[in-house]
Amino acid sequence: MSNLFPFRLEPWFRTRIWGFHDLAPWYDYKTEGEPIGEVWLTGEMCAAATGPLAGKSLQEITAQHGHDLLGNTYGDGQFPLLIKLLFPKDKLSVQVHPDDAMAQKYGEPRGKTECWYALDAGPGAHVALGIKPGVTPDQIRAGIESSSLEDLLEMIPVAKNDMLFVDAGTVHAMGPGVVILETQQTSDLTYRMYDYGRPRELHLDKSFEAMRLKTRAGKIPPRTVNSHSVLIDEKYFEVERWLLDPAKDASGISKPTGGVQILFVAEGKIRISADEGEAFPVNRCELAVIPASSHNVFVDAGSAATVIRIQPRVA
């Protein structure tokens, strides 16, 4: 295994009808065109911004250096997690994602289980996660036809730093008032059940096939482990929150795990160095990848910083 140096990825701004034209204060990004609703942080078109791999897309890096990059999380050779920021100014559709079995039934490699970490949440912010107990598929169909589907969904209040699990098969929705860091299987399979009168295509047959009336979706309490908090540890991913301080030892954040590690800076900024490479900064709302083969990686915070560490799991 050759030694790959860590690298920062450039974000990929994606247009969505429910997004914003100005992403301040999160990004210095304005557009007079279609609004931006998603910022992909590990999308296949995200390019390395630092080090020997600078200019190469994550798709190219994974194809050319798969085992060195992913290590024991190599799986099928595709980068295993898609990580995004969501900026909803309006309601997203009420939607559901398939599990692996259903996705593969229709020729796709994997389904879509995800989790949401609230980087910010305004007063009264909430999301819809799952169907209320006792509701039947016939009632759901009637709710779609009468534009009252929201009344049948479980509404979950959301505060800053909350973690929510959204397993495949969970009917869910999101609206304004939140900024979400989403970690998901690398899949963009979404079946819309209801879209608030907008003209986008609905996928009712597949939605009802994918939907489960009872799931494990919901808010996950953090678990303190030594110098960090485990926000969620599930089949496809583990997400941790590290509060870095120059006066405290946080060397565990960069210890090798045998697989790829992903660091997202939620607050403050950090600097990453490793053997045989030039150190580079990672600022707020930026993401860095630590390949499985990187040697002697050191993460330094000159002042207080909050870093979200994400590690894929190979199911």
Task: Give the location of each predicted region.
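Transition-metal
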Residues: M1-V135, D195-G218, V239, A315
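Ligand-binding loop in jelly-roll beta-barrel domains
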Residues: Q78, L86-K91, D100, R110-G111, ...
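His/acidic/aromatic-lined binding-pocket segments of jelly-roll/cupin-type domains
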Residues: I83-L85, L92, E114-Y117, M155-I156, ...
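Intrinsically disordered, low-complexity linker/loop segments enriched in Gly/Pro
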Residues: G111, D120-K160, F165
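Short, basic/aromatic beta-hairpin or loop at an interaction surface
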Residues: G134-S146, G258-R271
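An exposed, glycine/acidic-rich loop-and-rim segment of catalytic or binding clefts
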Residues: I144-L152, M163-F165, V171-K219
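Short acidic-glycine-tyrosine-enriched beta hairpin
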Residues: L153-F165, V179, A274-S294
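C-terminal amphipathic alpha-helical segment
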Residues: Y191-V260
